[in-house]
């Protein structure tokens, strides 16, 4: 994970040897292990590159990297497959080596088409004065652009800063493909032309042309007039990394496999009925296999202390977790945690991060330890809010519980995981957030991370994910509760399951209105817009803590496998809630030995954590959120 930035100026009066302080600070929070800046100047333009690294694999490689020909590379990504990267190697160096060997545009596109894993990048090709940049197919890594000064400068960055009342604000770079800017031509013409090399969505020529035309129109709509978007003249494309969605419909009328299910009490045995079918069981086993591989890649590609003596390994209380799971106890996070348990070394704890928003000031974890003992290596008070109130709260209500829905299911899920593997240390971290703390940190830290997204839903989920991934809370054990700060640099999240497996209520609405054909179109739309609705925002809020978000359900092989299945093998919305939606995932949970969690219906994070109940109750999720507006104009990082 990295914070990457490139500020380009076309006029001498806008040349600068440094980024503004607030932007630099935001980038450093993403990459705390190394910071470096590099200046490239020509007669026509200046490029200031800034790289900030979170070290997760191979040798620590400072960014930006450069070669003897003047090429410069900034990489914010992880290669999990497609290009070979040995355990001791750094994928930044591998990518730059291959890029420097590319002889033409086709070679560059071929290289990025091979990469499986999340990425965003900026590449300056000195010989052609070209600046290449883009995001992966799903947009799993944030990249923003900011055009200002009537075409005299622009900036690309993993994260921005915002101010209200300014028209030329940061926007997300669309995950439509890779872009190239001819900097020399732009400096002469005083207009920026974005050449798009789009993802190839299908094999049909007319369909491709229509998709490219639609992409160009959508991108241009949000840009200033001096920025033009055009398809590349050679009509070159990136190869789509996943197979197309199977839109097939059943030949016979679609009915539930077991009509008596809807009239029966829902139990784990209800799901076992489906697994008696040989084909269904085989498909579920295949799904478990591909998802397990995705989780394995994401929990093993990170540095571990392999030099501990056997005596130190036995001191499990001193062992730090390297991996955390955003954990509600729901079906998505339970399956991710169960699969992570299969691959993470047994002597290593796993942090389960469970967030809840408090409606009462005097709310603490059950069985709070009044002595305030601190656990070795994790002794950090989670927030100012608890520093102020912990002593009084402990005396007033030592056994009071915070019973928001996600806390209840989280505790139940913890017991399931402990029963499945009692040898593992499962760190259940209760993260409790007060209204005062929410409002203060939204104002000072979170709002600019969520932006340029701006809805009530973005506010709720963005804030909830920020507090959860921070990992500052209470570690609840049989002996009581202790202040705890998660040390995990990798945070697993279940995003992508609902979009692919008909987990949202809107899938049910579409199915009831338009049947399986409508459901297919809804799922296709969900996957197509996930980059602009969710992933850039989540990457920005999680990375703000110097941690990296990893998304197993959006592994290219997982998506391809699910895309290859007909929709009725993934979900059956004629069945009751808690079974029909995400049916294949529930069957996988049963096969993995999970119990009650396999039957939990979908509950959105903003409702399960109760953040949606903290402030206004009469808002719609799609409304623009006034709480995200920043009052001061002093925070803008790129001069106007």
From Swiss-Prot:
Keywords: Amino-acid biosynthesis, Asparagine biosynthesis, Glutamine amidotransferase. One of its GO terms (biological process) is asparagine biosynthetic process. The active site is at residue 2. CDD domains: Asn_synthase_B_C, Gn_AT_II_novel. Residues 2-184 form the Glutamine amidotransferase type-2 domain. InterPro entries: Asn_synthase, Asn_synthetase_domain, GATase_2_dom, Ntn_hydrolases_N, Rossmann-like_a/b/a_fold. SUPFAM superfamilies: Adenine nucleotide alpha hydrolases-like, N-terminal nucleophile aminohydrolases (Ntn hydrolases). Pfam families: Asn_synthase, GATase_7. One of its GO terms (molecular function) is asparagine synthase (glutamine-hydrolyzing) activity. Residues 286-602 form the Asparagine synthetase domain. This is Asparagine synthetase domain-containing protein 1. It comes from Bos taurus (Bovine).
